């Protein structure tokens, strides 16, 4: 089954603000985990475990390091996705960015009427403009518009 690039592009646009919020949240969580893991309250790295096993504190420390690494990877992936969408949007003109924003990123009720009024066109023309903006964004984002 071939990939529908325009659907992928639309999904990227719809998720854009949520991904930006996730980046902020992940950055906060990473800072908190770093301070907990490597701060003054972290277990001593040279502590000798009792009765030959790993200490409970050491186990928590290892788990915190693992969680920190997973959060950092999630942040890197999310950041790449956000930057790719922003590069795709930057390749468009202001009108196309506004249309995509109104349809997919920050959609509000009455967006088609508002765009038709702003650009002095019929609502059917707004949908045509949206389709062209999606094609251009898809091309800028993925290098292909249709396959």
Give residue ranges: language-model regions.
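N-terminal interaction/assembly modules
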Residues: 1-91, 114, 139-147
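N-terminal positioning helix adjacent to the helix-turn-helix/winged-helix DNA-binding module
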Residues: 81, 92-96, 129
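Short amphipathic alpha helix immediately N-terminal
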Residues: 92-110
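Helix-turn-helix DNA-binding module
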Residues: 107-125
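DNA-recognition helix of helix-turn-helix
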Residues: 120-140
């Amino acid at each position: 089954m071939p990939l529908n690039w325009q659907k992928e592009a639309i999904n990227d646009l719809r998720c854009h603000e949520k991904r930006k919020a996730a980046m902020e949240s992940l950055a906060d969580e990473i800072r908190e985990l770093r301070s907990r893991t490597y701060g003054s309250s972290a277990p001593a790295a040279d502590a000798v475990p009792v009765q030959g096993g790993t200490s409970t504190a050491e186990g928590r420390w290892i788990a915190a390091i693992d969680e920190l690494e997973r959060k950092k990877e999630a942040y890197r992936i999310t950041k790449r996705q956000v930057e790719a969408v922003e590069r795709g949007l930057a390749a468009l003109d202001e009108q196309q960015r506004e249309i995509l924003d109104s349809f997919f990123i920050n959609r509000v009720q009455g967006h088609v009427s508002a765009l038709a009024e702003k650009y002095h066109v019929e609502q059917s023309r707004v949908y045509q403009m949206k389709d062209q903006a999606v094609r251009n964004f898809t091309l800028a984002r993925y290098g292909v518009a249709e396959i």
